[in-house]
Regions:
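Bacterial N-terminal signal peptides
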Residues: 4-15
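Family-positioned intrinsically disordered, low-complexity linker/tail segments enriched in G/S/T/P
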Residues: 6, 18-140
Length: 140
């Protein structure tokens, strides 16, 4: 009887430890790429400006403290858009270009910003698209 209780306790402990694994190391990122040269007209259909089935390069940089703060992580991706100009990437799974790796980012040490750069030709001549602060997201 005592051995059965011990085995049951061990199985329950192992099951709980497997169920409580660490969250995944990555951030999903998705966007649609348009080939807009000049200004966009409000209310005009931009469907024919979508960069469908094109090879592009995307670079993600995580900055600390403010939008011009020190770079703590940088990576690049080479990907192809789909028929709607859509691409989906996971930040943390690209080609690392910084000294620190994604898993070593201390998210609790102040504000963090994500700078997104793109090269619409698939090369390394990047243009900055955005530089936005990270905000908390619940994880279950």
């Amino acid at each position: 009887m005592r051995a059965s209780i011990l085995v049951l306790f061990i199985v329950a402990t192992v099951s709980l430890s497997i169920a409580q694994q660490a969250p995944p190391q990555g951030i999903n990122y998705q966007a649609v790429v348009y080939d807009i040269e000049g200004s966009q007209m409000p209310g005009v259909d931009a469907y024919d400006l979508i960069m469908a089935n094109k090879q592009i390069s995307v670079r993600f940089t995580i900055l600390q403290s403010d939008p011009n703060g020190p770079e703590i992580y940088k990576e690049s991706h080479s990907t192809t858009t789909d028929e709607y100009g859509l691409f989906s990437l996971v930040i943390g799974q690209g080609t690392q270009q910084s000294a620190g790796d994604f898993s070593s980012i201390d998210w609790g040490s102040g504000y963090h910003f994500l700078k997104v750069d793109i090269d619409k030709t698939g090369g390394s001549n990047f243009v900055t698209l955005s530089n936005q602060q990270f905000w908390s997201v619940p994880y279950a």
